[in-house]
Amino acid sequence: MANRERDRELLIPVADFGDKDDGSSSKPSSSSSASSSHQSGHETLSLFIRGWASKKFMTGCVILLPIAVTFYTTWWFIHFVDGFFSPIYALLGINIFGFGFLTSIAFIFLVGVFMSSWLGASVLNLGEWFIKRMPFVRHIYNASKQISTAISPDQNTQAFKEVAIIRHPRVGEYAFGFITSTVVLQNYPTEEELCCVYVPTNHLYIGDILLVNSNDVIRPNLSVREGIEIVVSGGMSMPQILSTLDKPLASIGNES
């Protein structure tokens, strides 16, 4: 009897249990793969939506930032200029916004007319004589005067005469600068005409002064104000095509 029961135990099909286990385990694996693919699809969609939203948000910032800065600067400037004469109108009982600003603009215009005369120039020279005797104030005045003279519409007193392009610092590289004056270098028995070119290195009031032969100076078709805008904007307002004012200098720019 014992041998028969042992033989029956050996004949028990063990593979059926394995098949049942495989079937039961395959169902969770297939469901887990489906859920993982569904989850990856959600992640891809969310990443796409977030990327699209961030891109459109940055586009809106790029468009609105210069507009906001322009309006804010203009509004601040109007309030700043209006503040010079608005207290006077307030004492007179006139509280209309803009009167101080219009009065300041008219005052600046009258100052320009007066300083263009002989009497105004004499008064200005006398005031500069007193300012230049002050230890610390004269340095501030000289620096601010040089910047204002650079954009002056008067060609006789303008610090920046012309916009210039020179080879600097190596052959094949060009630097953007301004011609401030000309000088004659006497190297006996010959003389060489040099242009004093101011090349800004940091903003507009810090730079290098280079003496360059007048034949090596390329003069583009840019005004001084356009050149200042190019320097202040870091070259972003540079036109795509530059042409020279005279043909002989154009050939210099085309050399290797």
From Swiss-Prot:
Q: TM spans, by residue?
A: 61-81, 94-114
Any matching Pfam family: DUF502
> Where does this polypeptide localize?
Membrane
* Alphabetic keyword roster: Membrane, Transmembrane, Transmembrane helix
Q: In which tissues is it expressed?
A: Expressed at low levels in flowers, stems, roots and leaves.
- Record gene name: LCV1
What organism does this protein naturally occur in?
Arabidopsis thaliana (Mouse-ear cress)
Q: What is this protein called?
A: Protein LIKE COV 1
Which loops or segments lie on the Extracellular side of the membrane, by the record?
Answer: 82-93
